[in-house]
Design a protein with these regions (language model features):
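An amphipathic alpha-helix signature
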Residues: 20, 24, 47, 89-97, ...
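Short, well-structured alpha-helical segments
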Residues: 40, 44, 63, 67, ...
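Short, positively charged and aromatic/hydrophobic N-terminal segments
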Residues: 7-10
Length: 230
């Protein structure tokens, strides 16, 4: 089985590299992204996470579907404060299929529905069921970006964009108040980030998420200590 997968990987790799280079060239030319938490480097990292998870899952994933969904899953990305944000991934999936049809005419049309579903289902706010291994892997790979050291960096970067406070100075640990991650960045760790491992769809994704969530919990503990000690 391992030998077969290695053979399949090496047969796929030239095609994957070809399409990846085309996608990156297009994005560098046509995709201006002011939100640096969702820039081209984010797409590179999500793709890397996809490869890592796919390599450990027993079900074979179509790597071209994964590659395409990874690099275009934020083609439409509405701000967290936008009331229509829950529809962002659907709009993104629609735009991606349209783009592939118009700009990448040699892209295999038979996998367009799989690309559409993976992109549509990846979003946390959309709450769409994943019906393919590619959708499950992409969702986990993207959520991994919210955990670990990178997750902390992106958390406070995004909080700065939104004009949020770092924490509630009167009650930073939220012992006597309701958590409010719209106003306090530190609250987002408990509101969402520490819950992410339980939402992972793949076994390997959950294992990775649990490790990175522990890192975030250690960070929160240390930050609270620095805030509260005299």
């Amino acid at each position: 089985m391992i030998c077969f997968l290695m053979y399949f990987y090496y047969m796929e790799q030239p095609q994957i590299d070809h399409w990846r280079n085309l996608f990156i060239d297009w994005l560098n030319t046509n995709w201006a992204q002011d939100d640096k938490a969702h820039d081209l480097h984010h797409l590179h990292r999500v793709w890397r996470n996809c490869k890592k998870i796919a390599s450990e899952e027993p079900d074979h994933a179509d790597m071209l579907v994964l590659l395409t969904a990874a690099y275009f899953h934020d083609l439409v990305s509405l701000p967290k404060s936008d009331p229509d944000r829950k529809n962002s991934s659907w709009l993104c999936a629609e735009k991606t299929v349209d783009l592939l049809n118009k700009e990448f005419r040699k892209f295999p049309s038979e996998i367009l529905p799989a690309v559409h579903h993976a992109i549509h289902a990846h979003s946390f706010s959309a709450n769409v069921q994943t019906n393919s291994i590619e959708a499950a892997i992409l969702q986990d790979a993207d959520r991994m970006e919210a955990l670990g050291a990178m997750g902390i960096a992106r958390l406070f970067y995004t909080a700065g964009l939104m004009g949020s406070n770092l924490y509630n100075a009167d009650d930073p640990a939220a012992k006597h108040r309701i958590l409010n991650d719209s106003s306090f960045a530190l609250d987002h760790i408990d509101v969402k980030l520490l819950k992410l491992p339980a939402t992972m769809k793949t076994v390997s994704g959950r294992r990775m998420a649990e490790t990175e969530a522990a890192y975030i919990l250690d960070f929160k503990t240390k930050m609270l200590k620095e805030i509260t000690e005299d």
